[in-house]
Amino acid sequence: MSEKKAVFLTGASGNMGFAGFQELYQRKDQFNLVLLNRGSDKNREKFKFYANDPSVKLVWGDLTNYEDVLACVTGADYILHVGGMVSPAADYFPKRTMKTNIGAIENIIRAIKAQPDPDAVKLVYIGTVAQTGDRNPPIHWGRTGDPIKISVYDHYAISKTIAEAKVAESGLKHWVSLRQTGIL
């Protein structure tokens, strides 16, 4: 079997991130996982089971802190950037939302570029279908190529659109942006 790939996963304490973590963890024979989580009591409790697992490296920190991000990006083959501030909190705290969602991707891009071979790192960025606006009648579905049309006062969508543009304009060799739907 080939060498295990290193995966840096952001947002592992959130709904989508934890589901992604669980899927990757089931394949820990193929991956070494690095998780950057805020050091809250809730998060520490959630991940205490994995604290002594050599295939999981738990980093307690902040996506808006470049040094924390750099420590996690260093050595990563893949970065799955699922973390961020989401609605409804994103709309109550617009300044924090911008700092978190835009600052995090700026730190990730900068950290990738600081690697000895940045072209070897693959980035998966998670955006949102909210970037294309609401889906009121008569349009209930989204399609590839739909224009960016953010709803008024949707700070989450604004921050994710700016962050996605930063990825697209970053000059990174390997990246993709996926726009997730709502999670219930």
Question: What are these regions, as identified by a protein language model?
Answer:
Residues 99, 136-177:
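Catalytic helix-loop patch of NAD(P)-dependent Rossmann-fold dehydrogenases
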Residues 10, 36, 79-83, 123-129, ...:
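SDR active-site strand-loop-helix element
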Residues 103-153:
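Conserved Rossmann-fold NAD(P)-dependent oxidoreductase catalytic core, especially the SDR/UDP-sugar
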Residues 85-86, 129-136, 181-184:
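Active-site segment of SDR-like NAD(P)-dependent oxidoreductases
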Residues 52, 56, 60-100:
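NAD(P)H-binding glycine-rich loop region in Rossmannoid oxidoreductase-like domains
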Residues 5-29:
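N-terminal Rossmann NAD(P)H-binding glycine-rich loop of SDR-like oxidoreductase domains
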Residues 29-42:
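Conserved glycine-rich Rossmann-like NAD(P)H-binding loop of the short-chain dehydrogenase/reductase
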Residues 64, 96-107, 154, 158-159:
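Glycine-rich NAD(P)-binding loop of the Rossmann-fold in SDR/ketoreductase-type enzymes
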